Regions:
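Short aromatic-glycine-(Arg/Gly/Cys) micro-motifs in beta-strand/loop hairpins
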Residues: 21-47, 67, 74-76
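An N-terminal amphipathic alpha-helical segment
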Residues: 9-27
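Negatively charged, low-complexity tracts enriched in Asp/Glu with abundant Ser/Thr
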Residues: 1-11
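Short secondary-structure junction motifs
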Residues: 15, 67-69
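A short, charged, amphipathic alpha-helix used as a generic interaction element across diverse proteins
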Residues: 53-67
């Protein structure tokens, strides 16, 4: 989902957790846990998962959605 779509879900309290984890593309992805279960990835408008070069850049995207805390997943 795009940043705008995720902000909408957050505003309606449908997202309960933000997660940054390593990507197979040597970067970091941002996912959000939906209140009904499952993870929702941050994507571009074409539906491709967004990958960031460092943890701080990825974390900033979760903050943009509205979260004040972000869980950073281990690389192992």
């Amino acid at each position: 989902m795009t940043l705008t779509e995720l902000k909408h879900l957050y505003a309606h309290q449908d997202l309960v957790e933000a997660l940054v984890e390593p990507s197979i593309n040597n970067g970091y992805i941002v996912e959000f846990r939906h209140r009904h279960g499952g993870l929702v990835p941050l994507t571009d408008i074409g539906g491709s998962e967004q990958c960031y070069g460092d943890v701080d850049s990825a974390t900033q995207q979760a903050f943009e959605v509205g979260f004040q805390q972000v869980r950073i997943a281990d690389e192992y």
